[in-house]
A protein has these predicted regions:
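Bacterial N-terminal signal peptides
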Residues: 8-20
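Periplasmic c-type cytochrome electron-transfer domains
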Residues: 4, 22-233
Length: 233
């Protein structure tokens, strides 16, 4: 019995030594500084976007939010920017691969904090948020509208609001001058032919209006910033 007591005491002592060795680590100040540097709270202010004069305007962001959630800016009237970038899912879609009008080849990236990146899309092919914002609208398997039709619909639904911000925005009522299927797309010869048949000044008008559409959406997306994560606490 005495041996059992001694053996039990030795076991308890060994456990105490083990737990003592597993106590909370003591961080050096240098280590703490390194950890603080990984916190989202250490992010600097958003860098300016010199290519977007309305990037930080509240009225532009509010209008951009309306466009972001509007499925009328798609070929079937059912797909909005928010279709793939859902607020409840951290502005992703929760799917392995994106799904717009058709299946896509890549996972939908989050828009949270995207304003900090100088490059947009997985391959970095856009160098601004506003250039990224207009890409899915023209993509045949995302929102699927031709360039002229995007501008026509934005002018119809939001023309007054766009003019209040930019001073001008076209109403493309003349379908002979502005065909609904005209776009400078390499993968659609018919759309490209219709685009190249337009007068150069009309193409400039459409391009400028499309860029302005992207810029108000980017003003909204610029407000999607990360909050504190459990690591930060």
């Amino acid at each position: 019995a005495a041996r059992r007591i001694v053996r039990a005491a030795a076991t308890v002592f060994a456990c105490l030594l083990l737990f003592a060795g597993c106590s909370r680590p003591s961080w050096t100040e240098a280590e703490r500084a390194s950890l603080r540097g990984l916190s989202l709270s250490s992010l600097p202010p958003l860098p300016p976007d010199p290519s977007n004069a309305v990037a930080d305007r509240r009225d532009a962001a509010e209008l951009g939010q309306r466009l972001f959630f509007d499925p009328r800016l798609s070929a079937n009237g059912k797909v909005s920017c928010a279709h793939c970038h859902q607020p409840a899912l951290r502005f992703t879609d929760g799917l392995p691969l994106g799904q717009g009008l058709g299946p896509l080849e890549r996972h939908t990236p989050s828009l949270v904090g995207a304003a900090y990146s100088p490059w947009q899309f997985w391959d970095g092919r856009a160098d601004s948020q506003w250039a990224q914002a207009i890409g899915p609208m023209e993509h045949p398997r995302e929102m699927g509208l031709a360039r002229t039709e995007i501008v026509r619909r934005v002018g119809e639904f939001y023309g007054d609001a766009m003019r209040a911000i930019f001073g001008s925005f076209p109403i493309l009522e003349d379908r002979a001058r502005f065909p609904a299927d005209a776009a400078p797309r390499e993968d659609d010869p018919r759309a490209r032919e219709a685009w190249e048949a337009m007068a150069p000044e009309d193409r400039v008008t459409v391009d400028r209006a499309l860029a302005r559409t992207g810029k108000v959406i980017a003003a909204y997306e610029r407000q999607l910033l990360p909050g504190p994560a459990p690591f930060d606490r």
